[in-house]
């Protein structure tokens, strides 16, 4: 298995993230009650152990697991089906780098209680307190019971149109009257792809945002529409084609999103799920880290 040393990864970053002023992040993000994490899907072309190395090289202390894990750089395994040996190897590697695993997702939580219980059991075994999921409506009562039993949060994630939870109104409907352990995993990039204003979406979800897949995007270059072979008609996607860019350089108005989360008194994780330049996204993610730290420092100074 190919492993990258911290120094090797730091050199790849191209900016001296490891030498950033630690006080900048501490006095800003920590004062606001915020943490920045890497979502493992960001480095899906690499092994989970390389993902841990890259997270540490970025100077980050938090990471989330995706629904499947790449153990050796080639083969993936459904995360909740990891063997005890592999699960412990991941926990040990993260702990050795000073990294806390904060959530898993997107995971499947079906109405079948035994199947959903296995997911909660795995989260407890890994010391993880949040599951990111898109439960079908019929599963919500089961999910609520298990949240209370395990004291584990479930954050409902939004994919773009036409997925069930693309609109925050649907997320609110799902959690209305339920335990505060149930809320939203706000994927701000998918809101943009669905033609929604992330700031307005966050306002709707006030008090129910548990965690975020935080993104800044720009539209893809226009392409000719494809033709559906059966009908000969032009295929039109319901969501916009967009891709990730360093935070603060896209159309997401991310500073206003962060200001809104501060206004709400949000405490939690800003997850980096960077889905562009898969082979060498580290330099761009380093710019996201710099933006996050600088913006946190700025917001923490204001009343």
Could you describe each region identified by the protein language model?
Residues 1-8:
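Bacterial N-terminal signal peptides that target proteins for export
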Residues 64, 103, 132, 155-156, ...:
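Conserved beta-strand positions in the central sheet of alpha/beta enzyme cores
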Residues 64-89:
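Glycine-rich, proline-tolerant flexible connector loops at the mouths of alpha/beta enzymes
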Residues 73-74, 164-167, 222:
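Short, charged, surface-exposed secondary-structure boundary motifs
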